[in-house]
Amino acid sequence: MKFGKKLRFECVSEWHNKYISYGKLKKYLRYLYRSDLKQIGEAEEAHLLINGFPSLSDSQEQFKQLSNSSSPIFNDGSCLENSLDSSIGSNIIQEQSQHQQQAQQQPPQQAQQQPPQQAQQQAQQQAPQAQQQAQQQAQQPEQQQQQDLKESFNDITGYSIDQYEDTSNLDEKTPLISILDQSRPTTTTTTTTTTMNTSAGSGIFKNKKPKQIPTISIPVFSQSERERLFLSKIDEELRKINEFFSNKEKDIILHYNKLTEHCSLILKDRNPSPKVLKNIQKAFGELYKGLTMLENYVNLNYQGFEKILKKYDRLAPMNSSIKLDQMERIKLEKFHSSKSWRNMKEDVELLYCKIFKLDKISIAKKKLAPFSESQSADYHMLKLGFAIGLSIGILAFVIILFTNKSLNQHPDWTRFVSTIPIFRAVGIPILAVWLWGVNVYIWDNARVNYILIFGLDPRTSIDHRRIWKTASFLTAIWLTMFLLFCGTVTGNFALGDVPAQVYPLVLVIFFLSVVFFPFRFFHRKSRTLLFITLGNVIITPFGSTKFRALFLGDLLTSMVKTIFDFEYTACYFFTGDWMINDSTRCNQVNSIALPILSGLPLLWRFMQCILRYRETNNKIHLGNSTKYAVGFSVVLFSALNGNYQAYEPWSASRILWCVCFVLSTLYMYCWDVVVDWGFMWLGKPRPLLRHQLMYKRHMWSYYYVLFSNLILRFAWTLTITRIPFELPINSELFNTITASIELVRRFTWSIFRVENEHICNSIQYHAFDFSEAPWKNEVPKVESPKSLLPLSSSYPYRQDNFNNNNNNNNNNNNNNNNNNNNNNNNNNNNNNNNNNNNNNNNNNNNTNNNINNINNINNNNNNSPSGSNSSINNSFHLGSSSYSYDNQYSIWKKSSKQYYSTSLIDSIKKKFFNNNNSNNNKK
């Protein structure tokens, strides 16, 4: 895989603007070293103007004005005829200049013997000779002359003239820029050339006259200038990467410090609550995810610099390689030389083992891995193909059953119509699973981080293949039950003596068991998260307002018919109507329940918007709540006008209902387009769209959704109201069609809604979420490096320092006043041990919180036994260890807290490795 594609698919999508601009650097190298230039983009031409070089657009405009309109003209303003004439004329001028140079480069003795008059006469004699040679060249045979013209055209332009002999190819974008030899300085001048008369012999262009043409040229740099310009680009990329890396590293350090503090409290508590452990486990996962992303950021940028420098060495002349020197310099840059994030990653693994009582670091790495290692894609695709094939076969039987008149003799349409809502109540959620898989597939291909947006666990989230596999099996079961029911109702076939009304009941029981039973199949963790989110929506004033809860609330507003069908299903089976084949009572109940059930999702979303406004104080949520209030008014007027028939005259309330119907639809459409999708930017380069798009390869989809959403919004309004007009088809079939269309519209809406949310996260470079961490209200946002103060402290032990622990302790005990112990005590409870340390001259009183006094801890020791394995070094500077957090800490960070946190990590490391060594010795 090429590195450009690798960078596009492996980078953190929210940080893509902060990675190395590999594509732009490749274009810039192509500009510096290649003569057959393609069209130079706006960024490259702007760079030329900034550096004081002439722009190509001015020369092209002059060339268009002077070129003949009857000649074949290319898109960049150049003319084929003029280019050929200029090439031939330039060849003649070069020959003349060569003769003059030969005349001037004669031996010095002859030049001294010849008087000036003779030298001038000799030069005048050589000039006609050059003209005679040009005439002889013009009198060559026609085929040879055409071949010479083609060769001269190819040498200058880099393009073959054969592709231009056909006039159909003249409309293609083939720029023609005359470029001077790289060994000479270039100038943009207008020269008069003496061209040969092509009407005599050339079969390509006839009756062409010599004319004054401009020579378009671009700057040709020397090797030193090329190297200087390229290295300036490299320096710009390094500054961008180092600045972003520093900010993200500081942000991770803040959360790392808070994590160690809370872990120390958990270790003190012998029986922490499950909720605390769950929250701290999520915090561990997010911190490890951030460290993994930072590692990915460093590795990809380093590979990018290595690749682009390799390309530079390939294009540059011999003996001008800069790759080795520059890579040594890049290794010393902050983003690559920093060891803080590497050491933190090791410490997080050890701390996770201690908190959750794991024996091996490999187990902790597996649990902390940000992405799960699922089964192979081929395995899931095999199951998916089997289930889809089974579903297609059953669907074919259903179609034959309804289309073949010889089979459909005596159908029981009353029973069939009464059970349509039951099959629809199960079928619409299955369709939603299919559409969710389509959305996940689109987001994955477009690199939209939906996992972060919905707050999912990347270790347990399921991809589109597994979603489609589950949906295909559910579809096969649904079609099987529907086929058996239809065969029994029509009297064509039956499964023994089983009555037709049993099949809908079996389908409902199976569906509920799959959804609610806590078995380890059908993605139990995903189902659990779905029910938790659904509970938050139902108890909205007291629930969560995360994005997934808001998204599920919007989805429920589109599944009003499904909610209504579940109510009908419960009534149909609990009242016993399915035994007597009578749905009269349930229909009467539905006339009352429909307005209530239709308004519940709108009421939930309305309260969610009010709660969001209370939390964020953002007035845009009030506008969103108004949207749902208007929709609720449509439901209210529909309930008041539900008894009207199509032939009855229109009353004032009915007219008001229609007005609310239209206004609510238009209001919701405008809100979808402007706020939820972020469209309607009136300007270039994309009218009616936003500046940044994630689905650029399918630009038509944006304009399609702008049009289709307006039409399908009216279909949604029909799903929450009664239909006060007659229909040419059965009402249950019409409800099924409108419910399916509305569900498709909602999931189409979600594709662009999540895209807009992802772009908002990308603007803030928000790639990991600590919103559920125990310290979510304690850590300030890292806006700029100015909010951080330097703290001269080094990072504690690495794993390779444990074998030399005694040597490190001896190096740190040079300033003791009384005792030379091999180990130090690095606890935050130094004041509690003052009564037992009478020989230390009150060394343990250094528990002040001043940042500048942290280093004084290196001079203090306790009277612990010198050979104790459980002793902990209290020094931050451990011998030759130079692993530091780059001396950057937050202003709110207390020195005593950091002192305790590092001692906690040290103690965990020492105990962990001592236990491992003892186990190895026993073996």
UniProtKB/Swiss-Prot annotation:
As for family, the record states:
Belongs to the SYG1 (TC 2.A.94) family.
Whether Transferase counts among this entry's keywords is: no
Specify the SPX domain's residue ranges: 1-326
The residue range of the signal peptide is none
The membrane topology term of the UniProt record is: Multi-pass membrane protein
Q: Which organism is it from?
A: Dictyostelium discoideum
- Record-linked PANTHER family: PROTEIN ERD1 HOMOLOG 2, XENOTROPIC AND POLYTROPIC RETROVIRUS RECEPTOR 1-RELATED
Q: Name one GO cellular component term.
A: membrane
Query: Residue limits of the EXS domain?
Result: 585-785
Q: Kindly give the PROSITE patterns that the UniProt entry links to this protein.
A: EXS (PS51380), SPX (PS51382)
Q: What is its main location?
A: membrane
Name of the protein in its database record: SPX and EXS domain-containing protein 1
UniProt xrefs under Pfam families: EXS, SPX
**Any stretches that span the bilayer, and where are they?**
382-402, 416-436, 471-491, 499-519, 529-551, 591-611, 620-640, 655-675, 700-720
Compositionally skewed regions (Low complexity) per UniProt: 94-147, 186-195
- Top-rank taxon of the source lineage equals Eukaryota
Q: Where in the cell is it found?
A: Membrane
Region span, Disordered: 94-150, 185-208, 793-871
Give the intrachain disulfide bonds.
none
Keywords of the record: Membrane, Transmembrane, Transmembrane helix
